[in-house]
Regions:
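N-terminal helical hairpins
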Residues: 14-18, 27-98
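Short, charged/polar N-terminal "headpieces" of proteins
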Residues: 1-22
Length: 98
């Protein structure tokens, strides 16, 4: 079954200093990202360095709750597709969910 995670990509900072929150879907070792309508600012995130790479964690609980709710909706929709969805590739899953 596909896995879902919400995240912010450090290299995709907008000119106004905000970042778009994305949902990463992984299936059979391949990932795709779905853009959401939610953006976070510097006050909503924590930046860290991990092995020289910048990582961003969302700390705004309201955004976290919204993203978890969105992921739950995606999981429910994917489950409703039946067991055949387990054999879909990530492109087919994203197409189905969006």
């Amino acid at each position: 079954m596909a896995t879902f995670k919400f995240l912010v990509l450090p290299h995709q900072r907008k000119e106004d200093g905000t970042y778009n929150v994305k949902i990463r879907i992984t299936q059979k070792g391949k990932s795709k990202y779905i853009k959401t309508s939610h953006n976070v600012s510097a006050s909503d995130i924590i930046k860290k360095k991990d092995n020289g790479k910048e990582k961003i964690k969302i700390k705004n609980q309201a955004v976290i709750d919204l993203m978890e709710e969105m992921i739950l909706g995606f999981k429910k929709k994917l489950t409703s597709a039946g067991v055949e969805a387990e054999h879909w590739d990530v492109d087919r899953i994203v197409e189905y969910l969006t």
